[in-house]
């Protein structure tokens, strides 16, 4: 199983290193015979001798083309002859490529920016993560001492925790009497002990949570300061920290550094990405948070160190559990795309598609288009019309079906052969013409991207079929990861067409796909309404909610399935409308804002939920009660009564103060805040009293009654004394409770002023409610 590749230099020449696991053992293979190259298109082949004479300087040595050969390729499906130019060393290419490109006889150069080790994987047909080797994993985490205003890594590391299949342990240099804690004499000894643990356990995978941007850099800097050689690589190297866009990325040679943070950011949508929030979202269990100031206080006073050690141990354990959860999917993506898991786990979906296409282009002898320069990038920023959205029908509706197109955009790309190499192609016998935009796509041959996409969807169906047939739970899970990886990649192709930095960028393709998408959903809506008596309540891009007013649940379900048979017989190619769900009740507010409840009483909301921590418990609780009243009981008037009751209790100071606490996180050093929100004002007052505040600290506060700015009236919750303080009822009504429910009740004709307890007027409710069945 290939874990990764890189290259080193011996006697001025590159040597590819292949890090792999074979028969349970780690090994490194070497290849000294792979040469770097680029392609050049010449106006006249006779100019090749002039091109071979071009020289450049690199670190005091002269760089030139060492040999050239003429090769037949395809470019966007059309035959082309280019020159393959070979060089001595990969770094020769950036040194000389501009000079070659600027030569008058050169039309253009190609594939000059593909990293050498990645090029090797493509050309040799090698697939990382292929095979059934069992990989050893080890997660680690650090706790540090930080004081405001300090430079990064100025404070010591207090604890290093690690976890693997054998359990979790903590290394520290203060005496803590717990069975999973190993105590050493100094910070230096702690780092050395950790390095020894890694060497002895010899994991194939090191798992971190934001290790790219914190743990490794901190450890490396402290090691330098303390005179420790921070050796973690299997061939005796230190971790390599490199910039990747606006972030950093850390490589450990011979081991896969699997940083969960970018993977989880790409995979799931959460209001906050703390380790605690992620763990609760994935596993449904809360995890205790110990804040930086608490850690500092415990370390400096010696009180509460056991709690900090337990927290540190749990951090490593949770990171390990999350790693086990997410690693198999990334391994499948790595196999699918053909690049290392280290790269894939840090890639956007657009980059995943690009690496997949580069490999397939090589296999099909296609020359890859170049990435855009700055001028071309600016030109590509033009927008185009997106998917169809039908504005929602207001009111409370019952017996609702949700129908959507299976893989709408991939299906359109394949069905209509939407590809840069088929776009407006001359001399074709048959074309598909995109509605509204008029772009033509040749149907005489399968386009490069539609054919690849077709293969992917076909493979996914085979995997799903195999998954259904197998009774082995482990095999079933692996097959599920495979089909999900294929789905992620397949669903990214449409977005890739419109991705400005893409090699196979094609605005005409992207806007044609959305044009066909709009046509299909609009036609489908018209058919279900005119021929089957449905009313479509809300539609967005590839699906819609619909009901038959006055009909019972069984009638709606039966007619929906009849419609599916009817419409799918008419849809071309791979296009297929599917029955996705039935909801006994629902309402739709505006685009991407709705709430529905299924037959098991499970409520699904989109765009309405308040999950950020800067909403108080009273706001969240009131919104949940309002949703239940409307969706479970079908009673909008009851929902309004709930809001009036809560606002009345707030006005009369009958709400427990713990339900009014607002939590907000400090995200930068206090001195860097230009605007002073309530949480910043409270944090500054705490800091002035000597309490340690750092980025990541969560401030819990309550707003008091009085005049002046909110920030001046916000105090830490633990200072709130009901005998001395009164909360600002008006603030909580106007800024917490009403905003949480107003967006829901607006769908039934209510305005904010209609919801306060002292208001009695109601707005024509009957006009908004639909007949129940």
Curated annotation (Swiss-Prot):
It catalyses: DNA(n) + a 2'-deoxyribonucleoside 5'-triphosphate = DNA(n+1) + diphosphate. It comes from the Archaea. Keywords: Disulfide bond, DNA replication, DNA-binding, DNA-directed DNA polymerase, Exonuclease, Hydrolase, Multifunctional enzyme, Nuclease, Nucleotidyltransferase, Transferase. Its EC number is 2.7.7.7. The keyword Ligase does not apply. GO terms for biological process: DNA-templated DNA replication. Belongs to the DNA polymerase type-B family. It holds the Pfam family DNA_pol_B_exo1. InterPro entries: DNA-dir_DNA_pol_B, DNA-dir_DNA_pol_B_CS, DNA-dir_DNA_pol_B_exonuc, DNA-dir_DNA_pol_B_multi_dom, DNA/RNA_pol_sf, DNA_pol_B_thumb, DNA_pol_palm_dom_sf, DNA_pol_type-B. Disulfide bonds join 428-442, 506-509. In addition to polymerase activity, this DNA polymerase exhibits 3' to 5' exonuclease activity. SUPFAM superfamilies: DNA/RNA polymerases, Ribonuclease H-like. SMART domains: POLBc (SM00486). This is DNA polymerase. The gene is pol. One of its GO terms (molecular function) is nucleotide binding. It comes from Thermococcus gorgonarius.
